[in-house]
């Protein structure tokens, strides 16, 4: 893989190990330098105006560096074809790798939401609201950047009678919900929340972060608890919300199908 000089100079002779996790179109590699681990992330400039943009995520990491525990941004670079960033590995583990009780998992997700909600949204560099996400989704659809739909293996509760991405997109365009904007992670999962030995929470994969409705993150947490803990744990989480909005949760889970 040919790299820009500034990126190659930092990596030196280190071996790049592929580190593909999740469905992001970005390429991720880990490497060691002076007994420390780093990550190189690269995205095509085709995604520059989307939440998959590595430059977008790098700016978000920089903005969040004194607000949340996030990976340290080392450098960024962009040429005509790709966007690059190098981050330093954190000394923590994803909660997916920990043996947690349902109650512990619930407590971590609640604390994660509290940390995110504590961030003042003044001067937040990015918008991730419905307008932005629908525009992004239409770009993916028009450019055939989404995976083929497996008609035998998809969530019928979310898809209903829809057979195409465009059909689902049309529904979401016509039924958009009102928004109460907060700072949102945008992609909370058990592989994007890490815990260190002091039980401090770290956030990773912040490409979708920005101003969005509060129920974006709530819907993801409810789904994580329902799938990784139990239906009862998810219900307990919802019970402690000031005001649950099942319509919003359903809307944002549907919107997630278009990314």
Curated annotation (Swiss-Prot):
Listed GO biological process terms: response to antibiotic
Catalytic activity: kanamycin A + ATP = kanamycin 3'-phosphate + ADP + H(+)
Keyword field: Antibiotic resistance, ATP-binding, Kinase, Nucleotide-binding, Transferase
EC top class named in words: transferase
SUPFAM superfamilies per record: Protein kinase-like (PK-like)
GO molecular function list: ATP binding; kanamycin kinase activity
Gene3D superfamilies listed in its UniProt record: 3.90.1200.10, Phosphorylase Kinase, domain 1
Active site feature: 187
Keyword DNA-binding tagged: no
Family, per entry: Belongs to the aminoglycoside phosphotransferase family.
Function of the molecule: Resistance to kanamycin and structurally-related aminoglycosides, including amikacin.
Full protein name: Aminoglycoside 3'-phosphotransferase
Organism this protein belongs to: Acinetobacter baumannii
